[in-house]
A protein has these predicted regions:
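Sequence termini and other peripheral, non-core segments
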Residues: 1-16, 22-25, 29-33, 47-167
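Conserved, mostly hydrophobic/aromatic
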Residues: 40
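Short conserved micro-motifs on helix faces and helix-strand junctions that flank
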Residues: 35-37
């Protein structure tokens, strides 16, 4: 499971679609509707949020916005849809999910690691996107401006829950 802190516009097609599916799974996990992935480290920051389900809905909305911009069709009805394990409705009633959800802090070191990881993955599977990624990074300016709208950059190293890889 990879829930990127980077802005969705930086993700290639595979990363964007995988992130959408995996965040939908995270939404189910946070509702108590699955047995698996309940202790997955990628969920730590959402569990620490005062409104975890709303935060996941806001995150998914950001992915869907990027999908719309690319002409993809992500089913927004899945965002906040359904009920939790207690039967409570989880419907997302907020038109602008970012207006009422506190931002999640993400250390600059985490963003730097994720960007290096994404570049490594994209280099092997889509060299054309790698070129576009470099152009998008140059256009967006400093790394702090390259986060998903739900996140707020703070000073710091890679998150302790991150399982780092050498590449």
């Amino acid at each position: 499971m990879r829930i990127w802190s980077l802005h969705p516009c930086l993700l290639d097609r595979r990363a964007l679609v995988a992130c959408w599916r995996e965040t939908l799974l995270a939404q189910k996990v946070l509702r108590g509707l699955t047995r698996g992935y309940t202790n997955h480290p990628q969920l730590i920051r959402f569990r620490a949020h005062p409104q975890p389900l709303e935060a996941v809905a806001a995150y998914l909305s950001g992915l869907a916005d990027e999908a719309d911009a690319r002409g993809y069709s992500f089913n927004r009805a899945l965002i906040g849809a359904g009920e939790d394990s207690a039967g409570k409705s989880c419907a997302d009633k907020v038109e602008n999910p970012y207006a009422s959800v506190a931002r999640i802090p993400v250390p600059l070191g985490q963003l730097e690691y994720e960007l290096a990881f994404l570049r490594h993955k994209v280099a092997g599977r889509d060299p054309e996107w790698e070129q576009r990624l470099s152009e998008r990074l140059a256009a967006r300016g400093e790394l702090a401006a390259r986060t998903h709208p739900l996140f707020e950059v703070v000073p710091g190293a890679i998150e302790p829950w991150e399982k780092t890889k050498d590449f």
